[in-house]
Amino acid sequence: MRRSDPYMDRARELCLAAGVDPDSRVGEGRGQPAWCSYRDAARKEHLAREANAAASEIANLRPQEARFQNAPLKIFGVHDEATVAQMRNCMAVGNVVSGVICADGHLGYAQPVGGVIAYEKQISISGVGFDIGCGNMAARLDTRFDDIAGIVPTIIRDVAKTISFGIGRANAERAEHELFDDSDAWRESDMEAYRQKAVSQLGTVGSGNHYVDLMRDEEGFVWIGVHFGSRGLGHTSATRYLKAAGGKDGMNVPPAVVDEDSELGRRYIAAMQLAGRYAYAGREWVVERVRQLIGGNVTESVHNHHNYAWRETHAGRDLWVVRKGATPAFPGQKGFVGGSMGDDAVILEGVDSPEAKASLYSTVHGAGRLFGRKEAKRRFSRAEMDCWLNERGVTLIGADLDESPMAYRRLPDVLAQHAGTVRVLHTLRPFAVAMAGEGEFDPWKD
C-alpha cells in the first residue's frame, strides 16, 4: 500500500505490540506486509474516536426535546460498533420518533447506509444524502433467455456503447422528458440554473456500484435491472442545501436537520422531490433503451428509490421517514433488491407483521459491504473477481475491484435477518453486467 494510507502508522504500532515485524511478508507468494493484517483494527480505533468526537459536538447543539430522546432503534443483523454509534449520534438530533438499521447497513456519510429514521415535522438533508433518489428498477420481458443466449456478449457490448457510464458524462442521445417542461418545479427548488445540464445527463449511469444487469428468473424470462440515482442534479442540490443548513460533509458529523415548514425546509423538499422525479425518469429511459436492444415487451416492472424521504403515517402519526440505502416495503409493496456484482437479485414484497411495523416498513437495498473500497482493492485481484463471475456464467463489461463480489455479504444471508417482514417473489440470476470501467471515482453514488 502507499505510505499515504491513513491507518498505516497505527497498524504498524499494533503489529509491533503483537510481537510481529510489520514489514515481514504474510500470505501466498510475496504476500503483503504483516501490518496490513492490523489495518482494520487501526481503522476501527479511528472511527471510534470520530464517533466520540461527533457525540461531544452533538451534545453542545440545541438540546433535543425530552419526548424525542432515547427513541427506539430496531437493529436487523450484526453490525460493527462504529455503524451503531453513527446511527445513535444521528438519532440524538432533531424530532426523532424511531430508527432502524437494516441488515446490509454500514458506515455512510453522516448516517449509515441501511439506516432509517422517522422524524416529526423535520427532514434530514444528511440522511437523504448526496445521491438523492438513488434506487433500482427492474423490468421483466416476454423474451426468454434461451432465445438470446447465443448473442449475450453482443447485447451487453451494445448496452455499454449505448448507455453512458462514468463521471461527467453527457448522454450520446438527447433524452426528452416532460419533467424539463415543469418550470414551477425547477423554480421552487431553486435549481433552474441546472436544468440544461440535467437534460444532457438524463439516463447516464455513473460509476461505483451503479449498473445495468441482464438477468433471468425461475421461468427463464429475461429481466433488465438498473441501479443509479439523480446524478449531478441530486449532488448539486444536496451540496447547496447542506451548506445552507450549516451542515458538514463527512462520516461522523452531526446530521443537518431542518423544519418542514421553514423556508429552507420547503425549498429542500422541493429540490429532493425534483431530483427524485429525475432519477425515476433516468432509470425508465435506460430500461427502455436496453429493451430496444434486446427486443420483446415489458410484462412487469418494479421501481423504487432507496435514498429519499417519504411522508408516511406510522401508528397514526404523520412522519417524514428518511431512508438512506433502504427499500420501502409496506404490505404488498414490491421492491427490486440487487445482490453484489454478478450475484442473484430478488423481487420482494412487504408483509404485515409486528417486525415489519418496527422496521418502519423498510428492508435492505442490497447485500451490503464487508470491506470498504480501498480495502477491497487491496484484498482481491482481478483474476479472483473474473474467476468468481466465470463460474456463474456472468459476462462482465467494466467494473473495478472495489465492486468485487467477495467484498459484499451474500444477499440470502442478509434477507434472512429480515424474516417475517418481506417475502421473495422472484430470484433473478444475472448473466451479463455493464458498469463503468476501472479507476472511475463517482462522488454521486450512494
Name the predicted role of every residue range.
Residues 56-85, 94-100, 109-113, 117, ...:
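Domain-length cofactor-binding catalytic modules of enzymes
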Residues 30-37, 177-183, 433-440:
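Amphipathic alpha-helical surface "interface" segments used
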Residues 2-55:
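Amphipathic alpha-helical segments in structured regions that serve as interaction surfaces
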Residues 21, 29, 113, 141-145, ...:
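Residue-level detector of alpha-helical segments with a strong bias toward transmembrane helices
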Residues 125-185:
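A generic, well-ordered mixed alpha/beta core segment in the N-terminal half of proteins
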